[in-house]
Amino acid sequence: WRYPAAFFRQLQNSLLMRLNPEVIEKAFLSQKTGRTVRLFVDGDFKDVATLKMFMELCKARPDLKVYGYSKSWLEFVKLDATGYSWPSNYLTNASSGSRHERTGLANAFLGLPVVRGDFLAVKVDKAHINKRAYQDKTKAGSKEYRRDVLAKLKQIQTRAFACPGNCGNCLPQGRHACGSKYFAGVAIGIGIH
């Protein structure tokens, strides 16, 4: 973990999910009207029941725009197989590095209505990482870093977008590419750091 605060938030939330999920539910439901919410730091849902709980919370707050990243592809596919009706205000990104990446499950997951597309980590010049150009588009070297990411992504997929690193800072008016239906099928990527 690069950032201890993020680790401890994840630890706290993991414990709350096991011991007192009502606290998580209450916090989610108390979000300000119309907010964009990034759900789950790591995107890994423990099981289908946890995934369904969060999807039901999204349905309870249709005014929110909720998005996330997941490697829990099997849980999504299992929930979908039950005939589950997904919330219209939620999108997830298929995070690279899933253990299901090179299986038939990848196509099933990518075909779900709540999956925006791939979120890929690509190898870039270490100089970009050393300068921390991946953290924000205002950082020195960010344009060069994003150009490098985009070039690598386009080797994989023609429709691609390089993440500048700071959620809500990539599109005008604080919009999030990873949570936008307009970016459906577009590979969004970052440099491995």
Task: Cite the ranges covered by each PLM segment.
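Class I S-adenosyl-L-methionine
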Residues: 1-193
